[in-house]
Amino acid sequence: MITLHYLNNSRSQRILWLLEELGLEYRVQHHERDKETQLAPESLKKVHPLGKAPAITDGDLTLAESGAIVDYLAQTYGREALLPAADSPAWWDYVYWLHYAEGSLMPPLLMRYVFDRVKAAPVPFFVRPLVNRIVAEVDKAFLRQQIKSHLDFVEDHLSCHDWLVDGRFGAADIQLSFPLEAALSRTGMGGQYPRIRDYVAQLQARPAYLRALKAGGPYAYGPAVTPP
């Protein structure tokens, strides 16, 4: 049976969702972030040397990195359901979006999150104006433009396509879900992207997504309505 090592409010949620989409038997091993630092606990280092989540074990295989896990599960258990044919042009569209989600879209979003935490961190009162100014300048000069460029790109693609690849829901949509959920929740830019909002709502309405919410517990980036 597959074991998912699940960290709250993380990329782990999309792996749980994928397991539900595939109808696989699995068990969830929960790991909780440190409430002060928001970092993963030491318990995850017993699973993988880097102590990161998500990670899965499937028989003798232990695998980390959500993109690798999505690809492994889809190719091993759901090729026809969630992947385009390997000899079709759509295959490379899948590969592109699989890597784009974490390689291009997620880094500026993560940087924005880090700077938000820096801005909120306790510092001496006389340092606060300087910290706020530095964060604001980095956001204005770099992060906001980077995030906007990526969200413009995704919005344009989704304006012409119901799903990312091959005209149907698939593994690429699951992989892209987390950065889009994070972008809508944290950037304050969601109002500019109606197609992204509709697309994410469409993902979050899937029965397997809702089952994953119940299995995983509270998820900061999920829909506002508690699943039945």
Can you name each region flagged by the protein language model?
Residues L82-W91, V114, E137-Q146, L213-P228:
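A short, terminal or domain-edge coil/loop segment
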Residues E80-A85, P107-L109, D162-G167, Q192, ...:
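Short, hydrophobic secondary-structure boundary micro-motifs
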Residues L61, P179, G217:
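Flexible loop residues that form catalytic
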Residues R33-D34, F169, P218:
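Positions that flank functional sites
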Residues M189-P228:
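Long hydrophobic alpha-helical segments typical of transmembrane helices together
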Residues L50, T76, C160-H161, R206:
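Structured helix-beta-strand junction loops
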Residues M1-I134:
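GST-like domain detector, emphasizing the conserved glutathione-binding G-site
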Residues A101-A205:
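GST-like fold's C-terminal all-alpha helical module
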